[in-house]
Amino acid sequence: MTTVRLLWDVGTAYDLFVSLWILHQPADFGLHRAWAAGVRARLLPEEREVLEQSQELVHVPFSWIYTLPEPKDASVVLWTLSQLPARERLQALVAGSDWLPPTAVDILRGVADRGRWEDSDREALAVACRDAGSGAETMCSAKRLDSLLDWWARSEEFGKRYLAALRAYQDAFFAEEERRIAPALHQGLARAQELAARLDLLDLLEELSHGLRFEAVPEVSELVLAPSYWSTPLMFFGMLGSGREIRLFGARPLDASLVPGEVVPDALLQALKALSDPTRLRILRYLTQESLTPAELARRLRLRAPTVTHHLQALRLAGLVQLKLGLLIADDGKDSRRYATRPEGVKEVFDSLRAFLEKGDN
């Protein structure tokens, strides 16, 4: 068995980028679309445009964030970016990215140096992403290639506009947000470290991810765990170079909400929504009896696979199912993910509901 050294990190800088990612695809994370649109609407149109397009360029720049000095917050992000020449900011954020293969980055750097791109660059970039596999081909899909190339050809313009947009986002929303979430991050870190002292690594990862059960420990020498308020209950994965991986784990308390001032906790609301659907209740009953793949569930329910996947995603966001991860694609080419009911998640729903009802008005 691989021996993995466990490291820890904390800072609101991670949530600065995670929050932007989630605000641009709220439905995937169970966030109210209208509220997310309202946050984005606080920015000027040109600021919204560059932040939206940056999600296909920057994502969550794990390697760059990890190297930031303390206290690793939004102010440090903005200051560090401001110290770089504008044309180098995009390259700095993407350096070490695990979604964009090194050969693709080399092609894009050449585009940045020339200030333009040719059809041959597009073809070479598509080949580099396809050969890399592991999600890179999806991230470099045909509709994204032109956007990637256009912005890399205008790296200096991107660097100026992106920093200005990040500052505007900080002023309009995130400065207040990071003051709200910072205590929860440190509490989540302390709790995770306490769990790490008494659980083995696989059990720890399952607990912190609210139901992801890995078949084996990561094949890395070092694993960095960092709390994230916005990612709860999901995990964000990234690489920090050869042999070192980072995972953001959810640190939002069960009685808290992602939307500031919202009375009903997110975890409770997601769970009650999930349980209000008869198909999802049937799925939970099947998964209580045995673990099943999405394809097996589709056959039992006589539903199309995408429909079953949608229901499983809702149950996963509610923390009601365990997802057992081996190889995503088995040797026979079939999806090997298996789901099971998460008993502790079901118990948490009833405990949370009872606590909410007994709490009374604030």
Located regions from the model:
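Residue-level recognition of well-ordered secondary-structure positions
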Residues: R40, A226-Y229, A340
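Short amphipathic alpha-helical patches
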Residues: L43, F62-T67, L189-Q193, A197, ...
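Extended mid-to-C-terminal alpha-helical interaction segments
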Residues: L202-G319, L327, D332-D335, K347-S352, ...
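Residue-level detector of alpha-helix boundaries and kinks
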Residues: L23-H24, L268, R338
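N-terminal, charged low-complexity regulatory/assembly segments
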Residues: M1-V217
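Charge-dense, low-complexity intrinsically disordered segments
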Residues: P26, E262, A340
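Solvent-exposed beta-strand sheet faces enriched in polar/charged residues
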Residues: K324-G326, A340
